[in-house]
């Protein structure tokens, strides 16, 4: 799953470009910080990431399948306006984000300075 954020970033930027072309609107010019943040990840070396995706393709494909399942579930929750279910996912994601920040990753150390169980 560690490669999934890069794959999603590349695809989110592509989606913005495709949406912009289809709707003939300047989506990218007027996008907010979220797209900018994803585009930072998408600015990574494309040759390196191609090689990473290909060398670890089984795990990458498995992560994509799980992501698609979760994305389709999210789509259904939005379609049917499942307020409690959506809030549960959003709150849990916020909680996980806080846990990630609380780990105080140190990029200069192996495993980002975390104890790996």
Please give the residue ranges for each predicted region.
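A structural signal for well-ordered alpha-helices, especially hydrophobic packing surfaces
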Residues: 8, 71, 75-78, 97-104
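Anionic-ligand binding region
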Residues: 1-39
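Short, charged/polar low-complexity linear motifs in solvent-exposed/disordered segments
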Residues: 16-17, 67, 78-80, 103-106
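Interdomain hinge/lid region at the active-site interface
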Residues: 23-93
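A conserved regulatory-domain signal marking ACT and ACT-like small-molecule sensing domains
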Residues: 105-117
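N-terminus-biased detector of the onset of the functional/mature region
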Residues: 89-95, 99-100, 112
